[in-house]
Curated annotation (Swiss-Prot):
UniProt gene name: guaC
Database matches in HAMAP family: GMP_reduct_type2
Protein name stated in the entry: GMP reductase
GO terms under biological process: purine nucleotide metabolic process
Lineage: Bacteria, Bacillati, Bacillota, Bacilli, Bacillales
EC number: 1.7.1.7
Reaction(s) this enzyme catalyzes, per UniProt: IMP + NH4(+) + NADP(+) = GMP + NADPH + 2 H(+)
Organism: Staphylococcus haemolyticus (strain JCSC1435)
Catalytic site: 174 (thioimidate intermediate)
Family, as annotated: Belongs to the IMPDH/GMPR family. GuaC type 2 subfamily.
Matching Pfam families: IMPDH
Matching SUPFAM superfamilies: Inosine monophosphate dehydrogenase (IMPDH) (SSF51412)
Main function: Catalyzes the irreversible NADPH-dependent deamination of GMP to IMP. It functions in the conversion of nucleobase, nucleoside and nucleotide derivatives of G to A nucleotides, and in maintaining the intracellular balance of A and G nucleotides.
Superkingdom field: Bacteria
PANTHER family reported for this sequence: GMP REDUCTASE
GO cellular component terms, A-Z: cytosol; GMP reductase complex
């Protein structure tokens, strides 16, 4: 098995067939809806808020609301659907979450998307939850994860998941690899590659992206959608406190398994960091789209499909030589 990560790979250009990169189409069909970009902000408290979710849905971007304010989920679904927007929520696998799914069915509330969101998704508890959701609200598009192996993808798909999320601890504020010795940190792109070969349904690549070019690489190695935390954190619209250090503005960004998230120091696999303030999220989304349009033009196509067939070389950490000065 070839092992590599994002910084080890360069995609090889094909002849350009467009006059301008603006002709390149970055839209993606994911589940029941089509979106402007194959990108979704991480469902973390310092990345996604109800206000942002509303804005993303209204502007045809995919979002997944985090699961850390359980009582707010039903009002959130009701508000989104009342406003004619899609509802996309997260659930865990504790006993109360199974009751929550039954409550949704009782109220005839069907969110368009539900993400089963736990760190080690290749587990009996996730399989039970997939089946539970499909029994009570079968029309919901179920995303399950996270996994890091082809076996994990196959099992969750076979249980009824409509998409799987791949990535165990490669994110900037995830320290699973340090705390446990396990994970896809350092070989996330290779993990995506082997998982996508086993998949019959869409995959979300989750974590480890550091640049916009990594979005194109994720699509090349089998992702339909890419989940991004740190690149979306620390914007004007982002949740989280702003601090000033040495005359520069920063925003907090912490992992979902950090003690800041949990409120206690128990089974901690996430950390907190301050990321330099990045301005408007809307500007970042425009830049992401333009960069991805450029990627498509280099791939010699007009849409995302062209990225899936380009050749690549493995260059072992050398692509940033001289770029970080």
């Amino acid at each position: 098995m070839k092992i590599f990560d994002y910084e080890d790979i360069q995609l090889i250009p094909n002849k350009c067939i467009v006059e301008s990169r603006s002709e390149c189409d970055t839209t993606v069909q994911f589940g029941p809806k089509a979106f402007k970009l194959p990108v979704v902000p991480a469902n973390m408290q310092t990345v996604m808020s109800e206000e942002l979710a509303h804005w993303f849905a209204k502007n045809d971007y995919f979002y997944i609301m985090h699961r850390f304010d359980e009582a707010a989920r039903i009002p959130f679904i009701q508000k989104m659907q009342k406003d004619g927007l899609f509802a996309s929520i997260s659930v865990g696998v504790k006993a109360n979450e199974f009751k929550f799914i039954e409550e949704l069915a009782d109220k005839q509330l069907v969110p368009e998307y539900i993400t089963i969101d736990i760190a080690h998704g290749h587990s009996d508890s996730v399989i039970k939850m997939i089946k539970h959701i499909k029994k009570y609200i079968p029309k919901t598009f179920v995303i399950a994860g996270n996994v890091g192996t082809p076996e994990g993808v196959r099992e969750l798909e076979n249980a009824g998941a409509d998409a799987t999320k791949v990535g165990i601890g490669p994110g900037r504020v995830c320290i699973t690899k340090i705390k446990t010795g396990f994970g896809t940190g350092g070989w996330q792109l290779a993990a995506l590659n082997i998982c996508s070969k086993a998949a019959r349904k869409p995959i979300i690549a989750d974590g480890g992206l550091r640049t916009h070019g990594d979005i194109a690489k994720s699509i090349r190695f089998g992702a339909s959608m890419v989940m991004i935390g740190s690149l979306f954190a620390a914007h004007e619209e982002s949740p989280g406190e702003t601090v000033e250090l040495d005359g520069k503005r920063y925003k907090e960004y912490f992992g979902s398994a950090s003690e800041f998230q949990k409120g206690e120091h128990k089974n901690v696999e996430g950390k907190k960091m301050f990321v330099e303030h990045k301005g408007s999220l809307k500007d970042t989304l425009v830049e992401m789209q333009q960069d991805l349009q450029s990627s498509i033009s280099y791939a010699g196509g007009k849409d995302l499909k062209s990225l899936t067939t380009v050749d690549y070389v493995i260059v072992r950490n050398s692509i940033f030589n001289g770029d970080k000065d």
